[in-house]
Amino acid sequence: MLTLVSYDVVSDARRDRVANALLDFGRRVQYSVFECHLDDGELGTLRARVAALIDSATDSVRYYRVCAQCERDVAVEGLGRYEGARGTIIV
């Protein structure tokens, strides 16, 4: 399932570690936003990994699950394009 991940991490070093972890699971679509196609197990693994990297007193990470119907309605304005699961380009 498409999972949109956004984050606000105060420390530059922690922010880089979070971004690198997210790159293992998906693709960056904006500076602090990633699109990841994950099953429930992968999402759990990602959340545990990210939780170990952030300071929960100052940082935040949000995970939004996007259903298949809603994923079909994804639209992009301006720079970039939406790529579905496994690199399929949705036009």
Where in the sequence are the language-model features?
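Intrinsically disordered, low-complexity sequence elements enriched in Ser/Thr/Gly/Pro
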Residues: D12-A13, F25, T45, S60-Y63, ...
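C-terminal structural segments of small proteins and small subunits
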Residues: A52-V91
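Extended, hydrophobic alpha-helical segments
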Residues: M1-E42
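A broad, low-specificity signal for short, low-complexity segments enriched in glycine/proline
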Residues: L22-G26, V50-A51, E71
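Short leucine-rich amphipathic alpha-helices used at interfaces
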Residues: R14, N20-A21, L46, E77, ...
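Short, intrinsically disordered low-complexity segments
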Residues: Q30, E35-S60
